[in-house]
Curated annotation (Swiss-Prot):
Disruption phenotype: Prevents ub-hotspot formation and exacerbates heat sensitivity of cells deficient in Rpd3L histone deacetylase complex members. Leads to the up-regulation of the expression of the Rpd3S complex subunit RCO1 of the Rpd3S complex and down-regulation of HSP12 and SIR2. There is a cross-link at K231 (Glycyl lysine isopeptide (Lys-Gly) (interchain with G-Cter in SUMO)). One of its GO terms (molecular function) is DNA-binding transcription factor activity, RNA polymerase II-specific. This is Transcription factor-like protein EUC1. GO terms for biological process: positive regulation of ribosomal protein gene transcription by RNA polymerase II; protein-containing complex localization. Changing W333A: Leads to complete loss of association with ub-hotspots. Homodimer. Interacts with SLX5. Residues 11-43, 66-97, 190-214, 226-289, 441-462 are annotated as: Disordered. One of its GO terms (cellular component) is cytoplasm. Residues 105-135 form a coiled coil. The modification Phosphothreonine is found at T254. It is found in: Chromosome. InterPro entries: HOT1, TF_GCR1-like.
Amino acid sequence: MPAREYNYVEGFGGYGSLDDDDSDRDSERRNHDLGQRTITTSPTGVSRHAALNRYMIPGRINPLFRPTDAAQPPIVSTSTSASATEPTNRIGPGRIKETPETNFNAFLIAQLTRMEEQNANLKEEISLMKKEQELFFLENQKKLEKGFKDINKYVEDVSAMKEVFKEVVGIMTGERIRFIDHTGENVTPQEAARVGNPSTSTQAHQSQSRSTNWQEYSMHASILAGDPRIKPEPGLSDFENGEYDGNESDENATTRNLPLNNPDSVSNADDSNNQLDGTGNENDIRNRRGCVGTSYKLNRAIQNVTDAAREYFEGLPGQPSVLSLERRYGSTWRRSAKERTLFTKRMTIIKRIIDIKDDPSKYGLSLPENKISRNQAIKVVENIRLGNNTFKGHHCRLSMSQLYEYFSKKMDKLEDYSLTLKRRGKPRRIFLLEEREARLSLQQPHSIPNSSTGTPEHDQDT
């Protein structure tokens, strides 16, 4: 059965049958080509119809496989030469066949039209988005400019406040003399002199601070005086006058090397010491019951490692130990900056004692079974303070602050750690005075003769 031919109708957007064409168009075509013959369908035409069916809209009936009408006349096959010479095909008498290229071109035109519409919509959306982004950018740009202006204003205000604070601090410390014109003011000359001379108030504050510190030091020294195990540190005058004997390195060693927790070490104390011990015990009980821990201050009168270790591990007479305060209160008991600074310095020394006790071989100490007691570790650090050091090129008798500096700046060496005192040092100030005297002697003119003995230069001149 021959398939019915369909033509693309542009007005309705689909394919229509040739039977629906108007009669005027058919008659016009018949009058135009009266001598043409019917042409048989070639395989090439069939393949073109198949290609056209692939581009058909889904849901429509394929015209190549549509059942044919019984009234339609069959297509009469003719010779090949006639199909080659005739450009136009006819189906039945007086009916013109449309080529598949025309339908395919119409389909492409429709698709291109739809793509152009989509492109136009996309262009409109892009332009709208562009306008929105411009508005968003302008709005944020205004906010940023306003924020930068506010920041500049805040910076200027803070700079002005800093300048004011500098002036106030300078006036309070006396670095900047405050100028006030008292002309025409109702003030007394004494008040004007007091206001015009800020150094007076500064000196009064310094003297008051010194008196407070001295009172605090005296109180701490009295606490240390209640313990007969504590030996006072020799003063600078003892070294200058030669009253301090360097051979007394092992004096009172039995008292100092007793265990820190041995109560029998004070058995030779007199009755007054016993009374002090009783008072200390009562104070200890009262302090433990009260809230002494939160108001405790480190003893400023401590001058050696032994007393510092006793304060940390055991506690001074009538006072709790720093170790118990750390375990109970943490860092809340040292509230002021001075206490925190002093505690840091003391803990540097205490940690070195603990480290030596835990691993003595790390510091070159050869001991049986690599074990050392706490008292021996304290003695090692105390020997470093007394002279087993090379603090700035000399064997110095270090203070607690200098010992902290010696450890914190890692100036110590392995040969410094020893249970025996190799060499007793002198205070740092003695070496500084000797160096100063040596410089002054070199700077003196050689022409001035000595009253006792003549110099070689003077002998040559004479």
